[in-house]
Regions:
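A short, structured active-site edge motif that brings together acidic residues
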Residues: 63-75, 98-102, 156-157
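Acidic-and-aromatic substrate-binding clefts and catalytic sites of carbohydrate-active enzymes
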Residues: 23-26, 42-52, 73-78, 106-109, ...
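Short, well-ordered coil/turn segments that N-cap beta-strands
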Residues: 11-16, 37-40, 61-64, 93-97, ...
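Active-site groove signature of glycoside hydrolases
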Residues: 91-107
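Beta/alpha (TIM)-barrel catalytic core signal, keyed to glycine-rich beta->alpha loops juxtaposed to Asp/Glu
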Residues: 3, 104-315
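N-terminal binding-site loop/beta-alpha segment at the start of enzyme catalytic domains
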Residues: 1-64, 94, 284-285, 295-313
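Acidic (Asp/Glu)-rich catalytic clusters
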Residues: 7-8, 54-62, 85-92, 121, ...
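Short, acidic/polar
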Residues: 24-33, 76-91, 139
């Protein structure tokens, strides 16, 4: 498994991370992934999977890089603190490696939220601060609210069929030493990739390098040094397949051929598509208790797992 430096932290993490959005595989596939080198695990308070992740990393905490997210309905200062502490209990750990704002919340001052994040960092409860589904402008605002630490990552949708980050976000991340964490690197499964790849360029390249189509698609995604791809798989065999997408390199010609040959079928920014919907829902969910922070999905995302149970897919 290839390693990459996360943002400007100097810390190396696996270039393929295991995602747990709508994950139902239990402990074993996560542990298989860790053994396969995917020691970066991503979860969130709204996923309902933090407890499973905590069980999977029990006794091996120092070997893994654990990321979680605070939901936008918990962006008030005290709510951020309580949400983080709840995640720590669920994960059975005393610190998070990366804590991310899951979506922008336009009803709470960003400075208030970031002040709480900075306090968590000062107290050692989180090591690094990240964002998710933030635009370039929102990233700049978030960083401007921090006085002592830096934003190290932004998690957004990115794949062969959804390349919105190439319209400025990737360039900004590269210039500012921010890692782009790509969710849905396999789109919504092989069916979507097949429809976008009418000439079967993926199949041709896969045959050339002796890999599967999914492995080629993942390898294309992490070819950029600033990108880390987050895959999801409920079955151990699919986790192994995804982990084998790292440790080798496509040629520049193969990368270009894939970019030309696979058409874009999801070309609306996830931020543009869901941002306003999320903002409207925040008021509805604002009064919910932190006692059950994983009970609902406030992000409005659809499942991106393969139609086959546990197939190699992404968050």
């Amino acid at each position: 498994m290839n390693l990459k430096v996360l943002g400007a932290t100097g810390i190396q993490v696996s270039e393929l991370a295991i995602g747990t959005w709508k994950y139902h595989g239990g402990v074993e596939p996560l542990q298989v992934g860790i053994e396969g080198g995917a020691t970066f695990i991503d979860t969130a308070e709204s996923y309902g999977t933090e407890q499973t992740v905590g069980e999977a990393i029990l006794g091996i905490r120092s070997r893994v890089f654990v990321a979680s997210k605070v939901s936008p309905r918990h962006f008030r200062y005290n709510d951020v603190i309580r949400a983080a502490e709840c995640s720590l209990r669920q994960l059975k750990t005393d610190y998070l490696d990366l804590y991310q704002l899951h979506w922008p919340n336009y009803t709470v001052a960003l400075a208030e939220t970031m002040a709480a994040m900075e306090r968590l960092a000062d107290e050692g409860k989180i090591r690094f601060i990240g964002l998710s589904n933030f635009s370039v402008a929102e990233m700049k605002r978030a960083q401007g609210c921090l006085s002592r630490v830096r934003v190290v990552s932004n998690q957004v949708k990115y794949s062969l069929v959804c390349r919105d980050p190439e319209d400025g976000l990737l360039d900004y991340c590269k210039a500012n030493r921010v890692s782009l964490l790509a969710f849905s690197p396999l789109a919504t499964g092989p069916g979507v990739l097949a429809r976008a790849d009418g000439g079967d360029v993926l199949g041709q390249v896969a045959a050339e390098v002796g890999k599967t189509r999914a492995q080629v698609a993942l390898n294309w995604c992490v070819a950029r040094p600033e990108v880390i791809a987050i895959f999801k798989a409920d079955r151990a065999e699919h986790v192994r397949e995804n982990c084998a997408a790292s440790g080798w390199y496509l040629s520049s010609e193969q990368l270009a051929r894939l970019s030309r040959g696979v058409k874009l079928v999801q070309n609306r920014s996830a931020i543009e598509q869901f941002g306003r919907r999320v903002a409207r829902r925040l008021v509805q969910y604002a009064g919910r208790s932190l006692g059950n922070p994983t009970a609902m999905d406030v992000e409005g995302r659809t499942s991106v797992s393969d139609t086959r149970p546990g197939a190699p897919g992404s968050r």
